[in-house]
Amino acid sequence: MADEAEQAGLRILGDVLSAAHSAGDLSCLSPDLLARIADTFHLQRVSLFQVHEAEGRGIAATCVIDWRRPGLAFPAMTEGSHPPLTAAGGDPLLAQWAARRRRGETIIGRTRDLTGYLYGFFSHYGVVTFLTEPVMVHGRWWGHFCVDTPDAEHEWTAVERQAFKCIAAVLAGLLARSGTEGLVSEAARRAMLDTSIDAVIVADEAGAIVEFNHAAEAIFGHTREGVIGRPMTETIIPAHYIDRHRQGFMRHLATGENHIMRRLVEVEALRADGSVFPAELTVNEHRAGGRRLFSAFVRDISDRITSRRALERLAFTDMHTGLSNRTGLLRLCTGRPTRPSGAVVLMLRDLGVVKTSFGDDWAEPMIVETANLLSRMLPQEACLGRTGESEFTVVTWQPGAAAELAETLIGRLRSAIESGGRRFYLRVGLGVVERPGDATYLLRDAEMAARDCRDGHLLHFAEHMRAQHQQRLELEMALRDVIQRRTSALSLHYQPVVSARTGGLVGFEALVRWYSETHGPVSPALFVPLAEAGGFAERLGAWVIETAISACAGWNVRRRAHGLAPWHIAINLSATEVVAPDLIERVRQTMAFHGLPPQCVCFELTESAILNQPEIAIETLSRLRALGCTTAIDDFGTGYSSLSYLQRLPMDVLKIDRSFVLDMVDNSRSREIVRVMIEMAHGLGMSVVAEGVETTGALQILRQMGCDRAQGFLFGRAMPGDVAGTLPETLAPTG
């Protein structure tokens, strides 16, 4: 089909050439020939427009030849009906098209994409998809050859575009030979130059300027009289471009070879005040009176370049530190001739907590000073970037440089960093990769190592880490599936909570368990963070709340029937759940549905979950208490313990972390810490639960200290709900 179209195009071009040779003027475009052009290319209209002076008001266009399918209006464009193009105003798109046509550019498009006058004009005359080819006579815009098709989705093929360009060239040749171009008066030519939005500069084959329009005067700062006859190299070409310009110009004069002729290129140009600016340039060659003339159309693109550079800064630079961001760092690396030899990733573990707890006034100096420290320690030829909110990466090109930098860094970061009169101790992880490779993969592997390493240490990447991360991903996908389908693989177990004084069973803590068919039992310490990282901790938490409240309600129905006091249930909330906007309403509805009084439900949060977004956490805890639920701070003493926060937190219960209780019998310091915690909590009006009670000795000490409740293996491990419901009223120590 493509060959047939090309053959048809060649035949019609032959007809055009034959008619032009016979007629010698524009009468060659007979209705019959125009109809055959239209049929060959499936057109609905073929027209020729001539531009001319519109009574001193600018350039107008008149349709001098028109063939159209039946039913289409005739575009009778008189001097008064077409808006003239003036330097002071006019339709912006029309002015832009005029500038493009002066440069000899083809214009294609669809009426639906136009605006202003052109949209109204084209719509009125039924134009759908169009192509206009300028008719250039002696390098000047005489008019334009126009075609359009009714197909709104038509894409002009290379064969079609070349054919119409050839037809326009044939018409230009006829006009040049017949002298018809004289219809465009000197006044019209002057008007075209003066209304151009581009600087138009014409030079002869000696490089001397022979024309300089108003736009050129405005852009370059020269007057027309001051530059006519002077070489371009003395007026508008920067010194560092002169040699290149001369060589290219001489080569073109000698051989016709030129890399910029009739192409849109970006160059630098020189103003009268000596400043250099970026410009967009198109050059055409034409002959007049035996002379070779070169018309340059120049546009100042300073604003565009400034915007482009600003966008590049946004795209490739971290605004806080001025370092490359992740994309920018990889861009720098791929621009190097050789592959990097290694990478170091530094992760600031505490940055998120510092930001939410103390604000950007504390966090930003930490980030900036860390960036400065890395910049000062940067190995030769290395690249540095901030590749994440709390992550910096150094990519090295010298063998061994990554490991050496990491060793030096870890030693330096054990000391405080000072900035703005503040001292920071950073909890960090360092991941190191030492092998030649693509920067993308080096960064990925170093990040794996940084995530896996212990605080304050560095870890070299090893291949088994990839398998571990793959397993973690598989676990995350499996967990997501289990939560979505609510299969029996997920279950709740319940650990007893007793009165420390009497040993009487008062309730349970609900603990989620997952048994994977592929991986076996999976620790909550592994899968709960996976749920939080994967974005489905809220769904998991909703299931836990529903299941735990249902279980406790069932126990209490039976206990009430036997005249026994109700048990309470303690439910852990994650950092994700505590900021969920529908949490309070879900809790209220679930308790109401199962008939469990709010006084029987306690919600536990760790210190780190609270400090993630403290203000929202405090509001959530207050609203839970307003429902009638109790609230507890879990694992107290292991996180970011802050007395100021503890004073503000709407908490009823303080749970002492098991690490203090386990050491309490043999370690006087741990014992003293526990005593202080109990006294402090009681002083704040809070009751105390001690976790990790495994011996009668520990229980006895807690009783003496006045601890309210105890939880641990001494009273029982976490157990299924049906087993928990059968426990006796008092749990005698079993250990």
From Swiss-Prot:
Residues 472-732 form the EAL domain. Residues 342-464 form the GGDEF domain. This is Uncharacterized protein AZC_3085. NCBIfam families: sensory_box. Residues 25-175 form the GAF domain. One of its GO terms (biological process) is regulation of DNA-templated transcription. It holds the Pfam family GGDEF. It comes from the Bacteria. Residues 263-313 form the PAC domain. It comes from Azorhizobium caulinodans (strain ATCC 43989 / DSM 5975 / JCM 20966 / LMG 6465 / NBRC 14845 / NCIMB 13405 / ORS 571). Residues 185-255 form the PAS domain.
